[in-house]
Amino acid sequence: VSGLSANAVLDSLEAAAGRFVALDLRFVVVALAFQLANLALRSFALRNVIQAAYPERRISPVTVAGAYAAGVALNAFAPARGGEALKIALLRLRIPGSSVPTLLSAGVVLTLLDALIGSSLIATAWGLGALPVLPSPPVPSLGLLAEHLLVVGGIVVALVALTATVARPLARRARGIWARVEQGGAILRTPTRYLRSVVTLQLAGWTCRIGVAFSLLAAFGLPATVPIAVLVVVAGGLSTLVPTPGGAGTQQVLLVYALQQTATTAAALSFSVGMQVGITAVNTLIGITAMMLMFRTLRPVAAVRAARAARP
């Protein structure tokens, strides 16, 4: 049995290697163009949100694009989307008078539409059976539930008492922080401007993400249709929910399952690995280049060190 298993593994590896060799570079170039466009569109949408928060000063699209690209690059290697901290730190450093709560709130504005689109696509994919269904958790007994309710109730009472004790001294500071948070979402007060300068760019960015998946499916010789490309994007988005660098491992499992009706396991695995490695390489190259420009150095290592020093 072990001999057969070893042969099966070798056959799968050979099949995967063969797909890499047979890549259609024309579609790879198209995928690269879509990826660059996606990064540019999303960074410009973020710039417009920040510009609305700070109308008295001009926010450079290049500054925001550099910080955004650096954050995306780090997300591929840091767990739990650690690149977001770098993005905020670089924006705080390059935008005089800006504050962390305002910049964080500006980033949240972008997640509103992303969450709506992403959750809709995920729900549709699960409803069609394209994604695995998680098992239902066991129902606790009434006695155990009552014990937990008592514990939770005690904790809530303690928290309320503690909050009442420290709330007054912290109230003034909390109001100041909340004012800065509201400042970050200032563009939402002008729905027309929000739709024109943010939503349209985000929708175009989502189209580019689907274009990346579609082009890479074609490059690997797999069935390339819009529904399958959307499924690939959904699997990639779900993989980021697991706190591993770039969703590594999780993305491969989800894509192998999602593509089981249209591709062999070896083909789906080689496609998933190739797509993740390729996108990570592109994002990393762009991110390092952006940091070199922001810190005005020709040495990539020096740029990375400067970016690390800028992180909170």
Language-model features: where?
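Membrane-interface alpha-helices at helix entry/exit sites of multi-pass transporters
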Residues: 61-66, 84, 96-111, 263-274
